[in-house]
Amino acid sequence: MLDWRAPISSVYYENSTGPCSYTVSSEGTFSIDLKRKRTYEIENDHLRDFFDSDVVANDELLTKYLAKNKKAVLGEIIATIQQEQNLIIRRSPKTNLIVQGVAGSGKTTVAMHRISYILYNYEEDFRPEDFYIIGSNRILLNYITSVLPELDVYGIRQMTMEQLFIRLLYEDWDEEKYMVHTIDRADEKNSIKGGSGWFFDLENFCRTYEAEQIPREPVRLEKTGTLLLDAEYIDNYCREQSTLSMEGKMCMLNEILLAKFENEVSGKEVTFPAREKKALKRKYEKYFGDGKWRGSIFDLYLQFLEQQEEKGKAVEVPENSFDVYDLAALAYLYKRIKENDPVREASHVVIDEAQDFGMMAYQVLH
């Protein structure tokens, strides 16, 4: 008896009879000669039928099965997995994957089987808490989480896209003060907020704001005039450290400047009195800021919207009530400006009904 997720089980789903192979991670590829493929139909502990096939697909069984059982549970669907579905399920979890298909083609089912497969075969890399399932409504999410145990999957977190972005705002979100409203997709202004162009505008806004907040002038040591940091170094550092927030860059630049200062005043001919040295050290410790940005993400977002209006891209200004794209923008501002101690979130996100969300949401998640 073999688990359907085991590497050798791919032989059943992917191959016709005859010479074929399967691959086991870290052990290599094994060649075999597949003599027979047989599928059994068992109902109430009785063998009802069986099918021999020398082709890959299980179309005959699938058609018969779905015709008599419109409410199939996931554990029973395993027997009817098709070759293309199997390839999706078993694809490496290291890359992004988009599954496209008509309504009712099994996209959600394949996604759930894929989670089960990854947890089984990559147990050293992934745990249930590494997964988020994102859906457009709670009804669908509740269904997904209720049936995942049939695939031996437990502890997967699920939430709407709005809830995900709120989660990424951490302590800045006050549920007693702020509300969430459903986006009106028929409103043309909302389609503007959901596009890539809107994200690029927000990205440029953050870049400009950061340049205004972090001093770019050369830093020279008082008394000697020795150059500690030049403008080019500061500019290059801010550009290269793209994963750090503005607050994080300020903290790191302070540390770099302080190290340069300590190196310069140690063992040099020009000596500094202890009091003067202490005062300079205190100054350079906070030269780029005291390590805590004290602005408001929400005020900054309103500032961005005002700039957009000046460019002829006016949208409704939220008054403590936000739609999914407002929340996406707020989460991005938090990440770019304020985040200084990143919290480990999911490493694998499954988004159901992905077409319901504009590129703004995906650009922010990326």
Model-derived segments and their meaning:
Residues A111-M112:
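Post-Walker A alpha-helix
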Residues K107-T108:
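Conserved lysine of the Walker
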Residues L119-V349, Q355-V364:
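Alpha-helical nucleic-acid-binding subdomain
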Residues M1-K64:
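N-terminal accessory nucleic-acid engagement/regulatory domains that precede
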Residues V99-G101:
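Hydrophobic anchor at the beta1->P-loop junction of P-loop NTPases
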Residues A79-R91, R336:
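Pre-Walker A adenine-sensing motif
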Residues P93-L97:
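Pre-Walker A (Motif I) flank of P-loop NTPase domains
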Residues G104:
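Walker A (P-loop) phosphate-binding loop of P-loop NTPases
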